[in-house]
């Protein structure tokens, strides 16, 4: 999916508003995913998946850091996320549909925390961005 200059601007501005809350929002999105789509828990059998767990917070920070990297390299996400794509495809073997589920939960989390900034245009841009990230992360599956 091609991001327009307006999409890139919207994504960078929205992610800039996330600021120091990125890890917190990442963890919240994971919790939403585990509650809404319980089958996603199977990839985390060794985690304490309870609300506020240190492991979920830690993984939420990893998710947020990866998204921050993607935002910073929006014009070259395949290169920037190559190692992460390898990890998920070859070692973790995550079902690609789970990226879409997490993307949805991230959108809900961002909308809940940034209602003024979450305009229809920003929503559409973030959705396209997360779909692009998902495409990059699943590219090594083929």
UniProtKB/Swiss-Prot annotation:
User: Does the keyword Phosphoprotein belong to this entry?
Assistant: yes
State which tissues express it: Red blood cells.
Q: Which residues bind O2?
A: 59
Q: Where is the Globin domain?
A: 2-142
User: Which one Pfam family would you cite for this protein?
Assistant: Globin
Record-annotated residues binding heme b? Answer: 88
Residues with Phosphothreonine modification: 109, 135, 138
The GO terms describing molecular function are: haptoglobin binding; heme binding; iron ion binding; organic acid binding; oxygen binding; oxygen carrier activity; peroxidase activity
The organism sits in which domain of life? Eukaryota
Q: Give the modified residues of type Phosphotyrosine.
A: 25
- CDD domains per the UniProt record, alphabetical: Hb-alpha-like (cd08927)
Carrying Phosphoserine, the residues are: 4, 36, 50, 103, 125, 132, 139
Q: Which residues carry this modification: N6-succinyllysine?
A: 8, 12, 17, 41
Residue spans crossing the bilayer: none
Q: Which Gene3D superfamilies match?
A: Globins
Gene Ontology biological-process annotations: hydrogen peroxide catabolic process
Q: Indicate where the modification N6-acetyllysine is found in the sequence.
A: 17
Keyword annotations of the record: Acetylation, Heme, Iron, Metal-binding, Oxygen transport, Phosphoprotein, Transport
Q: Name one GO cellular component term.
A: blood microparticle
List, alphabetically, the PANTHER family matched. Answer: HEMOGLOBIN FAMILY MEMBER, HEMOGLOBIN SUBUNIT ALPHA
As for family, the record states: Belongs to the globin family.
- Protein role: Involved in oxygen transport from the lung to the various peripheral tissues.
On subunit structure and binding partners, the annotation says:
Heterotetramer of two alpha chains and two beta chains.
Mind telling me what this protein is named? Hemoglobin subunit alpha
């Amino acid at each position: 999916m091609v991001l327009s200059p307006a999409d890139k601007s919207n994504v960078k501005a929205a992610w800039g508003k996330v600021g120091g809350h990125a890890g917190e929002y990442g963890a919240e999105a994971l919790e939403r995913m585990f509650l809404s789509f319980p089958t996603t828990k199977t990839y985390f059998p060794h985690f304490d998946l309870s609300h506020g767990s240190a492991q979920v917070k830690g993984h939420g920070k990893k998710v947020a850091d990866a998204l921050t990297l993607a935002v910073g390299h929006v014009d070259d996400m395949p290169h920037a996320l190559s190692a992460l794509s390898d990890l998920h495809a070859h070692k973790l073997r995550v079902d690609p549909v789970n990226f879409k589920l997490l993307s949805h939960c991230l959108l809900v989390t961002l909308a809940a925390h940034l209602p003024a900034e979450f305009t229809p245009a920003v929503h559409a841009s973030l959705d396209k961005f997360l779909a692009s990230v998902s495409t990059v992360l699943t590219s090594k599956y083929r």
